[in-house]
Amino acid sequence: MSLSIGAHVYKKLSDSTELAKLISDKIYAISTKTEISFPFVIYRRNSLVPEYTKDRYGTGDTVSVEVAVASDNYLNSVTIAEEVRKALENKRGQYDNFNVIDAKLMSADEDFIEDTFIQRLVFSFNTE
């Protein structure tokens, strides 16, 4: 099921050696749960839209995932965001319950909140 898209996101991000050099293993789903040091990455599923044929057969889903990079240094946050993009964009994956057949960066923005530089990237994943 595409509801498990987080497994794909985590795998691709944690498999990136370049990203690991920048953030170690600080990749979290939805929340860090506890206070941690910078920099780190958080991801969350924003939406899931099922796709059906005219005969109502499910053909897959389009899943939107937001990945946020948090750092105390602006240039570092941008560098990490670039590595996140490299790790996810156009990457496919096969899992027990679903396959990721396409991944595209849909948007990116940045912010500064409570002494933290934030880079937000939104990806669209097509699954079957």
Task: Please describe what each predicted stretch is.
Residues P39, V63, K104-M106:
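Short beta-strand or tight-loop elements
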Residues M1-Y57, L75, T79, K86, ...:
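Small/polar-rich, solvent-exposed N-terminal microdomains that initiate assembly or binding
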Residues K54-G60, F112-E114:
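Short, solvent-exposed beta-strand/turn "edge" segments of beta-rich domains on protein surfaces
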Residues T59-D72, V84, F117-E128:
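Oligomerization/assembly interface segments of phage tail-like spikes and tubes
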Residues K86-E128:
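Acidic-leaning, charged glycine-interspersed low-complexity segments
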